[in-house]
Amino acid sequence: MNTSFSLHKIHSQDNCPFSEEEYSWFKFGDKQFAKEFAKQLFDAFMKEYGDIILQQEQIIILPSPYLSIPTASNFLCSYFKEELNNFLFSNHKKAALESKIYRNQTYVTDYGNLDFEERVKLISNDTYYIDRNFISGKFCILLDDIKITGSHEHTVNKILNEYNVDGDFIFVYFAELISKDIHPKI
């Protein structure tokens, strides 16, 4: 399995399905909103994938790759993992483990203003490392706060294919930009 799930779908720039103010606070490091968003995301995710989660022997959760400073999505992932492990414990399952996609970033450009092709070109110069032996054959949840162009997912899938990593992969997002008519800088 290789699929994605997003809690909120952004179809219009004028009608955001979540509080933009709260999201801004979250992006600037407010952990309370990270915790609230993680709970909302977890609850919605479990409605769709709860039965599949309970069938897994081992679950690996991977936050979005970052260089050295944890991002807001990293905190979202941490709180999501906390919710997941509480659920697993209450169902007599093993706790999810965390792995990391290591990234050596090669640019200082404002990534947020780029479209899909520009993003892929830019991040293709970065180097990535993933412990394929650790995640191989496992059910992996790759978590990020928002899917804008899909370049992150594209790059991670490319890495998984290059390293011939076998397993089940689900990309989980708090929000996803659906309309391609909206500029990525939204």
Spell out what each predicted region is:
Residues G29-E48, S73-F87, E153-K158:
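Well-ordered, non-membrane alpha-helical segments in soluble/globular domains
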Residues N2-F18, H154-I186:
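PRPP-dependent phosphoribosyltransferase catalytic core
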